[in-house]
Amino acid sequence: MSMSDPIADMLTRIRNAQMVEKAVVVMPSSKLKVAIAQVLKDEGYIDAYAVKGEAEKPQLEIGLKYYAGRPVIERIERVSRPGLRVYKGRHEIPQVMNGLGVAIVTTPKGVMTDRKARAAGIGGEVLCYVA
């Protein structure tokens, strides 16, 4: 059976792995998941990520980050989902926790944070909030 929302599955795997203090979480890979992992790494929410395995079924490994025994990611939640897509224009992209968190947005120029999308003057689909 196929998965209906692979991005929600990715976020849930990260959330669950951090609750049990795992160092690494493994999941099926896709181009969009790798792009989201790159944004999380650039923003300092994860240590590293790598795509491993054979070409037919690549696996994405994400190294989770902790500070003083607590997960760096306090909150990670899906916004746009298959049943209700959430698109925002360049002036409507929300701030997360008054700028302390990030919204990950997929735009025509690629996957980026809310700050970069606002600076570039482009809108897109709001995938998730991370704080």
From Swiss-Prot:
It comes from the Bacteria. InterPro entries: Ribosomal_uS8 (IPR000630), Ribosomal_uS8_CS (IPR047863), Ribosomal_uS8_sf (IPR035987). Pfam families: Ribosomal_S8. The keyword Amino-acid biosynthesis does not apply. One of its GO terms (biological process) is translation. One of its GO terms (cellular component) is ribosome. This is Small ribosomal subunit protein uS8. The lineage of its organism: Bacteria, Pseudomonadati, Pseudomonadota, Betaproteobacteria, Burkholderiales.
